[in-house]
């Protein structure tokens, strides 16, 4: 995989390399997000022991590690006579530190820890002995997010408090797609983001000269597609998981629109409490997130909770691939599925939540808001001459660090222009959020522009802002 712009992260590592102290950095993030490429770019022109662990016995891992140490140190004997223990490896690294600055990067460290549980204690001991040596730069890296947050960076981890820095590498945000899809329109880039998300490995697979439909067929739907089995590879990284089929059933339910815990439990045939535990595990893995109205004062106690798949590609796969795998055996099947189901459903699939999330991210950056998200709840409205409680939702709400609503927005991914009535409804709901406070600004986002009346009113209202898709990219 090619190295893509990780300027901030690379700069942070380089600044630590120049610091007058030992460094111990934890770098983790989901599979395919670019951790290895970042480490290798950082390691350029540095004396480095880089080791990418794989599942295997301790002796196999030490043999591979000895080869990496031999390449970095010039001690060819290590390759012929591998080290026999991790204690011996850390002793050898200690000797190498006497020769000058040394970067030691242990990638996919979760495989080492599972095979040799005592390695964490050995690292702690090594760090205690050498934390005063400015020649040492140690990186632990890996793809098992739940393992790293539990065993490496969490409060209960044996290594907690010893690291000097940590980086949780995330997928690229939507605006970064311009580097992967040169020449694509903002509309098509949003569609691509809805399918492939911001994971560099997935985006690298795309052919910018081909259409989105061609890329989806070739890489996701075809039997030999590069990403056809990607979710299964993703789950294979987590050896502590049991009942993969149940987790897949949960993700499939969420992708189909069942976002409340009781709806998910009913779909997978588990109790609410058992489903809650499974959802907790998926959240630990960074695959699912808990969503609540952005204005909720105490998110941990609210009952207004929904669950969302956090990765657009996983959402697409569980919506359009997993339920139909039994009929996708040939390339001709993939073409038929693409034209018969995927493309006719794509605009609806893009509209929510992906287009709304793109608008939320833009507004967060534009306003410097503390938090931006959805809002939903009960609103009193006059229906048939009487006041009734009506359930309403807002696509975008931004709040500041005081919890005050700064802005409210509406998003429309449709072929027609956004009508003036959208502003009227948005204004009424925004007033409901701030009945006694200052009126928030209104932001209206539209794929296809705005009608003449709405445009005219917005021109004369400094608190009303119209945003087209071209401004988002």
Task: Describe each region flagged by the PLM.
Residues 1-337:
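Phosphate-binding site recognition
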Residues 301-473:
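A cross-kingdom feature that marks ATP-driven nucleic-acid transaction machinery
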